[in-house]
């Protein structure tokens, strides 16, 4: 009988005085998502993250939105990062590295990832307005910082150019999604090895 591949899934439930969040991910999914954070623009961005990474995501977040969106966005990034790290396990056999330049109309953004186990964010993105609708643009960076720290990934995001702030934010999410899609894929040539001369990525 053929050996069954291990399931690459991860689930996290996180509750604080500010938020209550549950997240489940499947790295070998098809980009299906069920997302509810109470923040419409953020839900739209997370849908892009799931769709273009092909990572199935179930996200339910309830936060102190009567104060602002900050805690909900940051804590959702924490939970997604932790769930992805669980799904990666010891990171054996993964492609590990990926980068992409992603275009959307007038905007071009680059994302590069290393699933190194070493969390780091390089953020070179500037918005020309403090809000997209009612969403604070500074929260885009807060989300990716929380994601990188808790997934244990090195993440570089560089916006080359763009005029529309919605497009700039959306290309950040889509570019990271496409880079994660490649980096998390199993490379059959690795034959189950950890892709590091150190022998470990955790």
Swiss-Prot record:
Reactions catalysed: D-erythro-1-(imidazol-4-yl)glycerol 3-phosphate = 3-(imidazol-4-yl)-2-oxopropyl phosphate + H2O
What EC numbers are recorded for this enzyme? Answer: 4.2.1.19
UniProt keyword annotation of Amino-acid biosynthesis present: yes
Going by the UniProt record, its keywords in alphabetical order are:
Amino-acid biosynthesis, Cytoplasm, Histidine biosynthesis, Lyase
Enzyme class comes to lyase
The record's subcellular locations are: Cytoplasm
The keyword Transmembrane helix belongs to this UniProt entry's keyword annotation = no
The Gene Ontology biological process annotation of the record reads: L-histidine biosynthetic process
Q: In which pathway does it act?
A: Amino-acid biosynthesis; L-histidine biosynthesis; L-histidine from 5-phospho-alpha-D-ribose 1-diphosphate: step 6/9
| Superkingdom in the source lineage | Bacteria
Tell me a Gene Ontology molecular-function term this record carries: imidazoleglycerol-phosphate dehydratase activity
Pfam families per record: IGPD
Q: Which GO terms describe its cellular component?
A: cytoplasm
**PROSITE patterns given in the database record:** IGP_DEHYDRATASE_1, IGP_DEHYDRATASE_2
- This protein's major location comes to cytoplasm
Q: Tell me which NCBIfam families the record gives.
A: PRK00951.1-5, PRK00951.2-1, PRK00951.2-4
- Family, as annotated: Belongs to the imidazoleglycerol-phosphate dehydratase family.
Protein name, per record = Imidazoleglycerol-phosphate dehydratase
* Species this protein is from: Rhizobium johnstonii (strain DSM 114642 / LMG 32736 / 3841)
From the UniProt record, report the name of the gene that encodes this protein.
hisB
């Amino acid at each position: 009988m053929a050996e069954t591949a291990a399931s690459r899934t991860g689930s996290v439930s996180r509750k604080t005085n500010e938020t209550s969040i549950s997240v489940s991910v499947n790295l070998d999914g098809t980009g299906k998502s069920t997302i509810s954070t109470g923040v419409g623009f953020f839900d739209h961005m997370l849908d892009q993250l799931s769709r273009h990474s092909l990572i199935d995501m179930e996200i339910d977040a309830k936060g102190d939105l009567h104060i602002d969106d900050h805690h909900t966005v940051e804590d959702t990034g924490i939970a997604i990062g932790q769930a992805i790290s669980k799904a990666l396990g010891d990171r054996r056999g993964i492609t590990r590295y990926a980068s992409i330049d992603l275009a959307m109309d007038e905007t071009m953004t680059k994302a590069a990832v290393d699933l190194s186990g070493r969390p780091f964010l390089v953020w070179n993105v500037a918005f020309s307005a403090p809000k997209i609708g009612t969403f604070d643009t500074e929260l885009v960076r807060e989300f990716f910082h929380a994601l990188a720290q808790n997934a244990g990934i090195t993440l570089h995001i560089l916006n080359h150019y763009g005029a529309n702030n919605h497009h700039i934010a959306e290309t950040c999410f889509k570019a990271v999604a496409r880079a994660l899609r490649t980096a998390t894929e199993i490379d059959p040539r690795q034959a189950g090895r950890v892709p590091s001369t150190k022998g470990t990525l955790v």
